[in-house]
Amino acid sequence: MEHRVFTIANFFSSNHDFITGFFVVLTAVLMFLISLGASRKMQMVPMGLQNVYESIISAILSVAKDIIGEELARKYFPLAGTIALYVFFSNMIGIIPGFESPTASWSFTLVLALIVFFYYHFEGIRVQGFFKYFAHFAGPVKWLAPFMFPIEIISHFSRIVSLSFRLFGNIKGDDMFLLIMLLLVPWAVPVAPFMVLFFMGILQAFVFMILTYVYLAGAVLTDEGH
């Protein structure tokens, strides 16, 4: 049996799936409450949480428009932005002693990767049409199509693995690093490791968001749109 560090979820159950689900829901609730607090009393001159959220949204759109264009960046922001924020909150909650990052579970990061995978294919088919979309998989040279098509299929499926394992591996490694530091010194002392994990959490959320936009751009932008 896999040994797990005690968390607040263990007060209710020691089941692995329950613990992961518990922190998935808890993270979603915390994210919703914080977001609600940021948007509850909107002001013309943003202050506090509203200012933070507007800065985050502006930063995401500023980066995304260079990848997919401003119009599509805004169109797909509800997906990419929500995933970025959720991954960020999921990463951050694991820094708190007694809590566990949902993104430290591969089953959860796999779900996120599958959401992105199916959505960008859905959008590609919707925008370009079924046959035109998959025709791109064959490449521009017809006689190479029998070789290129299966390679492209494998390449797209490998994105599920790379997206899910990249996030899972980094956050799991961060959690193990934090655990070792807390065993060596009191929790109030290792400020530097906490800061490293904080910035790593931001970085992983940023990377996941960027890749979401990159995959969407590859699916919906035609050759003329590049």
Swiss-Prot record:
Disulfide bond sites: none
GO molecular function: proton-transporting ATP synthase activity, rotational mechanism
Pfam family, one: ATP-synt_A
Keyword Amino-acid biosynthesis in record: no
Source domain of life: Bacteria
Location relative to the cell: Cell inner membrane
Membrane topology: Multi-pass membrane protein
GO BP annotations listed: proton motive force-driven plasma membrane ATP synthesis
Cellular component aspect of the GO annotation: plasma membrane; proton-transporting ATP synthase complex
Chain segments annotated as transmembrane: 18-38, 79-99, 105-125, 134-154, 179-199, 201-221
Record keywords, A-Z: ATP synthesis, Cell inner membrane, Cell membrane, CF(0), Hydrogen ion transport, Ion transport, Membrane, Transmembrane, Transmembrane helix, Transport
Membership in a protein family: Belongs to the ATPase A chain family.
Subunit structure: F-type ATPases have 2 components, CF(1) - the catalytic core - and CF(0) - the membrane proton channel. CF(1) has five subunits: alpha(3), beta(3), gamma(1), delta(1), epsilon(1). CF(0) has three main subunits: a(1), b(2) and c(9-12). The alpha and beta chains form an alternating ring which encloses part of the gamma chain. CF(1) is attached to CF(0) by a central stalk formed by the gamma and epsilon chains, while a peripheral stalk is formed by the delta and b chains.
Listed NCBIfam families: ATP_synt_6_or_A (TIGR01131), PRK05815.2-3 (NF004481)
Protein function: Key component of the proton channel; it plays a direct role in the translocation of protons across the membrane.
Protein name: ATP synthase subunit a
Source organism of this protein record: Helicobacter pylori (strain G27)
This protein's encoding gene: atpB
